[in-house]
Amino acid sequence: MKSISYLNTKEKNKKKLSIPSKTIFAKENEYGLKKPNWLKIKLPLNNKKINKIKLIMRKNNLHTVCEEAACPNLAECFNRGTATFMILGSICTRRCPFCNVSSGRPSLVDTKEPENLSKAAIKMKLKHIVITSVDRDDLKDGGSEHFSNCIRFIRKKNPDIKIEILVPDFRGCTELALNNISTYPPDIFNHNLESIPRLYSKVRPGANYKRSLELLEKFNLINPNIPTKSGLMLGLGETKEEIIEVMKDLRKSYVSMITIGQYLRPTKNHLTVNRYVHPKEFRELNLIAFDLGFKHAMCGPLVRSSYHAENQINCY
């Protein structure tokens, strides 16, 4: 039965990668609250750049979190020639109920991926690259050495490129993971808290709020000159006071960059949206972030952790 389940997961993932860009956006109003006007996205009439980036990905056997997570900003980012690469395969060892990435038994690590990633960065003429990954609890180091290898290959071929990594929590191997990544450190180290402590068991089963904060703080202690970053999604039942407390916790852990966006339900099988946060509330949180000492803050309904990431490094 396990082998059949694995094949179904792989087949599902294969089909998902071939979905045309114009159909990847979840019609959330079919499943819950009516989607407000400020969340409606205009799709581009010309998909030439989108298709070009997809072709580069397929030729180099690469994945983007933009496609895997059904990001609402895919069309905009692809048309700007940017993408967030997802390494270590497209199958996650965890099953967070908010996330659209496939879960199951992952494949072997592709040792050619760092080189292929470097080639894609050159082909796309990237000045800023964001690299993330699925959770790989099956690997002794959580995939951290692979992150390090990707950074090394990219810098070798693209010495001027800015590299941002969005990492998992490296459960059970934090020290090893941070040592591996610090060998070839990025320009920005990002790990998303995603939600408030009270909702963690619901939103991030298998994760731990304190552990995630410690990961960010420990990286900063090892690499004090490299900015750390984190992100939150709203609309799952949190209060404004709880959001601000999380922001304060991040500052206590030396995090200097933050992104806050609206949670959008990928399918009817995922967590239900509790409410749609008005843009005015996001603007208020943006001001609060700067008052708390964040050097960069981006808060808005469609903001995601890598949204306009190329502009964030300018604050340093």
Swiss-Prot record:
What EC identifiers does the entry list?
A: 2.8.1.8
Can you name the source organism?
Wigglesworthia glossinidia brevipalpis
NCBIfam families cross-referenced by the UniProt entry? lipA (TIGR00510), PRK05481.1 (NF004019), PRK12928.1 (NF009544)
Protein name as annotated: Lipoyl synthase
* Record GO cellular component, one term: cytoplasm
Q: What is its main location?
A: cytoplasm
Family matches, as InterPro entries? Aldolase_TIM, Elp3/MiaA/NifB-like_rSAM, LIAS_N, Lipoyl_synth, rSAM
Q: Which residues form the Radical SAM core domain?
A: 78-295
What Pfam families does the annotation carry?
Answer: LIAS_N, Radical_SAM
Q: Which reaction does it catalyse?
A: [[Fe-S] cluster scaffold protein carrying a second [4Fe-4S](2+) cluster] + N(6)-octanoyl-L-lysyl-[protein] + 2 oxidized [2Fe-2S]-[ferredoxin] + 2 S-adenosyl-L-methionine + 4 H(+) = [[Fe-S] cluster scaffold protein] + N(6)-[(R)-dihydrolipoyl]-L-lysyl-[protein] + 4 Fe(3+) + 2 hydrogen sulfide + 2 5'-deoxyadenosine + 2 L-methionine + 2 reduced [2Fe-2S]-[ferredoxin]
Pathway it acts in?
A: Protein modification; protein lipoylation via endogenous pathway; protein N(6)-(lipoyl)lysine from octanoyl-[acyl-carrier-protein]: step 2/2
Q: Which Gene3D superfamilies match?
A: Aldolase class I
Gene name, per UniProt, is lipA
Q: Which CDD domains match?
A: Radical_SAM (cd01335)
